[in-house]
Structures are given as structure tokens and as C-alpha cells.
UniProtKB/Swiss-Prot annotation:
Name assigned to this protein: Small ribosomal subunit protein uS4c
Keyword Cell cycle: no
GO molecular function, one term: structural constituent of ribosome
Encoding gene (name): rps4
Source organism superkingdom: Eukaryota
The species this protein was found in: Pinus thunbergii (Japanese black pine)
Amino acid sequence: MSRYRGPRLKIIRRLKTLPGLTSKRPKNRKDSMNRSSSRKISQYRIRLEEKQKLRFHYGLTERQLLKYVRIARRAKGSRVRSIAITEMRLDKSFSIGYGSTSGARQLVNHGHIRVNDHMVDIPSYPCKPQDVITIRDQQRLRAIIKKNIDLFQRDKLPNHLTFHSLQYKGFINQIIDSKWINLKINELLVVEYYSRQA
């Protein structure tokens, strides 16, 4: 299944707020709200909606999400969460401080991002502690990123990242702490949804 490129407000109406998908808010529709509240919601639908929240928030394909759930289930020692794995992707790490996830994904795809002085053009590249993320030295590219920095730097940076706006450089300090993840989701329901496949 490919990445979703359809109407985003349609998804927001169904799954509620997803900061990674869009910052727009749908208008209240009283008729549809009354109809939906009278329906009985099945356990399958509850699990499906939690899974879809995770998928649409991070812009993942079905295959990518299943892969992260499998990695999280196989991890030994401390419990590794699939949501923490997705937060450590290059497109997500780069987007914090530089712009939106979709914009970051495009910059990565076009080969504008370097990790530890090596060009990386895979948005799903897993970042690790001590990684240094920089951009190619292009004046036009820096102007675009400077504009994004002014827009997105109002929010406090998560503790797993350090960002130097003047040098256009980011550092991965550690694996992200769950309290910094701005998506409220019941991961157990996602694991239960995939229990027959993972």
C-alpha cells in the first residue's frame, strides 16, 4: 500500500488531531457527529483507528509500519516502542527545527541532507545517538530552511535533539523520551491489530 496523498481533512475528521499530517482543523459538522455517536464501535475498529493514527501521523506505508512493529516486538532488554522507532527516522528528526515532515522527506529524497558527512537520500534512515545532521551548502536551499526555522522554532525542541540554527546543524543526543512524543496513542492496540501478521 502506497503513502496517502488524498484529502487530509477527511482523515482528521475521522481520526481527530494528527500534528504530523496537517495543522488544519475541520469545521464542526453536527449532523455527522450525531450519526457517528449513535453507532456501536467494534473492537476491531478501535484497533484499526489507533493503527491509522500512527500511520498517517508519520506518513508511513502499511509495510513500513508493520516493519517497525516487528522490530519493536523483537527488541530485547528495555521495551522498545514502535512509536519511538518512527520518531528516530531521518525525515522526522530533520523536520524538528527545519520544517514539516513532508518537506523534510522531500529534501532527503533529493539528496540535500547529510548524516555524519555522508549523503543520505532515504527518509526512513534510522538516526542513532551521536549522529550529526547537516544540509548541502547551497544558498537557495539555506534560504528555504531559514524560512522554515523562523516558522517552526517557536516550539520547544525535544531533549533528544540539539539544533544550531546558524550552522544549519542538528545533533542526535539520545533515543527520544516518550514524554516528548506529541501523538497520544495506545500502542498496545496497534500491536494487537498486527498480532496475526507480525
